[in-house]
Amino acid sequence: MPKEFSRSQRVAEQVRRELAELIRLEVKDPRVGFITLTDVEITPDYAHAKVFFTSMKGEEGLDEILTGLHRASGFLRRELGKRVRIHTLPELHFHYDSSVERGSRMSQLIDQVVRDDDARHKDDPES
């Protein structure tokens, strides 16, 4: 059975796609060039949208990226209004999403434990 999404979830996904395209193609600020939008959460009244992003640089230069995004937020919101038809255009709030880095770190730790365990069992003559 297909997963059902609420209207606000569909709108949030459309906002994420449109913002990603706008940032990639229209925003000329080099500070925001290498980011990926990971999620958008919109309040039920559509007044606010939390826009989560990651950067190829990790947390390096995060302040500059946030400054660039905040400076572009008016332009992004205006252009978003031309592309997405909703009764209230949300105010954009940008947040760094560190979950990708945490997930990568967890994966590295698990891989290391598996390698250590394999090496221990290889050296153990009883196994």
Swiss-Prot record:
* Protein name per the record: Ribosome-binding factor A
Q: Which domain of life is it from?
A: Bacteria
Q: Which organism is it from?
A: Aromatoleum aromaticum (strain DSM 19018 / LMG 30748 / EbN1)
Q: Where found? A: Cytoplasm
UniProt keyword annotations, A-Z: Cytoplasm, Ribosome biogenesis
Which processes are annotated in GO (biological process)?
Answer: maturation of SSU-rRNA
Select a single GO molecular function from the record's annotations and give it: ribosomal small subunit binding
Which PANTHER family does the UniProt record give? RIBOSOME-BINDING FACTOR A, CHLOROPLASTIC-RELATED
One GO CC term on file: cytosol
InterPro entries listed in its UniProt record: KH_dom-like_a/b (IPR015946), RbfA (IPR000238), RbfA_dom_sf (IPR023799)
Q: Quote any Pfam family the record assigns.
A: RBFA
